[in-house]
Amino acid sequence: MVEHVDALPRSEDADILSDDFPTNTMPYVISASAGTGKTTQLLQDILLDLLNRNADEAHSSIRESLIITFTVAAAAEIRRRLEQNLQYAILYARRNHGCQPGSLVLLDTDYQLGGDDSELARTILHDCHHAQTVFSVALNDLPTVQISTIDALSKRIVDRNADTLPVTPGFQILADDAMKNRLRGQTLDALFESWYDERNSMHARFMDVLDNMQGPRHDGDLRATMMSLYDKALTKPNRIGWLSRLAEPYRFNIASLNQVVGGEYGNEYLDRYFQGWIDMAEHPLAELRSCLDEALASCHDAHTAQQDTVSLRMICDLPQYLRSESWNAVRARVIDANPLDVLPKRITVGKTAILKSTAIAVPKDSELGRRLAETVRGIKGIVSDLQSKLAFTAEQVDSLDEVAARRLEGLISLITTFDQQYALAKQQESVAEFSDVAFWALDAMQQPDVAKRIGAQWRYIYVDECQDNNALQNRFIREISRNAAKLTMVGDVKQSIYGFRDASPEEFGDICNSVTDASHRRELWVNYRSVPEIITFVNTVFARLMTPNMGATDYLKEQLQIGSAKQAGKPFDAEAIELLVSNAAPDLSADVVADENGTDTAPPVRADKDELQVDMIVRRVQELCEGPHAQYSYGGIAVLARGATHFADLADRLYRVGIPVEVQGVGDLYRQPEIQIALDWLRIISNRHQDVPLVAVLRTMGFTDDDLARIRLHNRGWLFDVMRRIAESGGEADESTVLSSDVLLAKISAFLRIYDAACDYARVHSLSDSLWHLYAVSGLFDFAGNMPEGERRQANLRLLVEKAGAFAVAQERGLQPFLDAVTMWSASGSGEEASTVPTKNAVHIMTIHKSKGLQWPVVILMGASNNLLTGSRTAAVRTIAHQTRNEDGAVAEYGEGALSLVDQRNHVRVDTFQRAVIDSRAKELEAAEELRLLYVAMTRAERKLIIAGSYRPGKNDDGNLNLRTMAQGIALSGDGRTIDPRTVVKNSGSPNYLYWILGSLL
């Protein structure tokens, strides 16, 4: 039986944010923008450092360099480019040996060294012989240089120090998410079964938390919430300790406060909650006060008028009351003495506004009357909103907060217990997650001898794509560079798009801001990728949208600068930016179509707004690449989108018109027909008495419905056994009947030969080898290759073999365990389909995330009008990071969370103000991430950028598209320069890229 282990908050659980690097490793930072060549600059710095540290004849090998990047593919690309740069630097030094700067034989026209006037080129030319020697040695040593991801580097450190760590010998890493989720699921299954037992000490706490998920029927929601919080905690240096203060927002007493907002002992969540209302209400309430003062100024009986407008002035003073009175006192003003009851008695709002008073009369058609009418309409909603916020007494709110805190504490306990049991399960299976390896590596680097050895091995550390690192990875970088001679960090906060992995772009921004020494800081804003028209457009959009409060950077300080000398003197291209919007209004005239005989037919199939947008994009691609005025090749066009929902439809429509396509990750691997056929083969090999997969396999072998019916009529029992008896009897039936077709008997015999061969092979070979054998004897691999998109389908079959091999190494051996795992992976959607084989001249279709680091002549941003920011509406518990200062003065980070209280028995749901505040902040963070995604998408284009979306015109638009109407609702902040961050998140509809772009332009 699993027992409860309390998760008590401890000071040592804090994530200490000691961003102060040791004096000898104050980082060198390269802060860059898109298309400015930041990785190129990093490679040049590596070569320059290598020359400088060998200047005094002291040998310093390139093996002392450690290069860290974000992905395995990026690491391979850096190694390739570094090899090219070394080869070119050697050639540059050899060809220019003895030359004066003005008469060089070989010019650096491609800027591999940064140009002939760069510091690297000048250093090479200062002593060409020395440069040749240094770079030649470095080129020979390059294969041994550590260029890798943090995950791979952590694994290396752990492997070399395993004897000092709690590591299971021979452990395997759960690199496949599906396999990881399988082991997690098994652990959760066992825990939930024990927690449902009333005798378990965790039962009451478990059921209390489960009640907030609407009861046992929704325990899947609890599992999802636990795993979401668990994954977030694993990106923090303090692991589960990051969750220890999750309930902190609920740990205070409202009834003891003398004032609701701004009190000495107040609560920041309470202040934020009501400050938002004050910010919204102050202007309309000030306008109401102005109207009252104007009316009183012309009144003949001021004393009586003052008496008659007391209740109205009380409404105007509500912000002041929130700052000076207790919760219950303010509540009495807006609930007990309901001003909404008084308001209609004093002011009638219709075509005109009349202030009802014995002493005051406002003319119906006066300017004051119209102002009063407009103001009162808004005030009703404002007062009603405050009433909803103060619906409960302070004592009731405190009671609700106690329940919320208790449930969050219970959730922490459940996650802590899971963490312990999951650790045991991983130990028993001899497996580990990447996060486990990272924490082991951090533990190893805390040991003095290990730290000393690492410091001696890697003296010069270079980190690329720093904006995508999470808190745990940033801690790793600080630890591994503690004894280094130099640390260089490269990144662009504007391109941080991995919030779903809990990336922390703000931390890299803070590091950049902390580096005040100009010699340690370099800024790259000159864009060499895009034409000036695109650069100007991008700057215009993001100068208003991206601010320190929305996007984590001040774009005006980092805006792109035009750097393409090739564009000098060229005329302005008005078509470099296109807005491609499909009219999503229903075409009523096409609802019923009559054929030539007068018979009504169904409306056109392609009528959905997303289908219309796909068709519009297909037509535009044809126009760009076909006909006498074609300027681009298919391979020069990329279609990018936030998600892959409509990729299959787009690829299909492009294929239909003869346009080649390269799609990355479209659809679910386990739903592809070739994979289903392979799995059905495995199922009947594992257990031949499964008629459904057997029939599916037989159909692929050419069996018709008539053939299957004849087999079934032949005898009763399992279909496979019937076929075996038919083959053994030569087609004779038990009742003196024979199969009418020798062809059918031949089909059965051929199938059984293949089946028996596959079974015999599978008994003595590994699962992955058995799959390759099955592909060969059944002809499945060739069959898939001859289907439409054959290369992609064969890639899917290869991926299934890889998954089978990885499963056998990291999990259980055997066919049936693998099939059980596949069933679970398929149900959970854990299988992304393999991409198509890269094609030189094909339209590229991919998500914005996968496009990072790439570029094309033409980029089409698809789905720019799709809704964003849906996450805050689905999560049962939302969290934000909260920094505090410990007793020793160190800054620590914890997670703080909030939820909506649910009473499943009474079917009651109460939204807490803490949840409202955290939801608001979380939506702002989501919006900032989406802004950065939009920036990445728009900066992939070299010559043409096309924004594609759809729009449904309003009733007053006469069915026509109106750009100003499309952008209606977005507002400028008080400085008139940037967009108010709140309007980026909150508007009349759900935010989308098209809304933001048009709002920033109009």
Q: Residues of each region from the PLM?
A:
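Conserved ATP-dependent motor core of P-loop NTPases, especially the RecA-like helicase ATPase domain
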Residues: 12, 19-30, 62, 69, ...
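C-terminal accessory regions
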Residues: 702, 710-714, 840-843, 872, ...
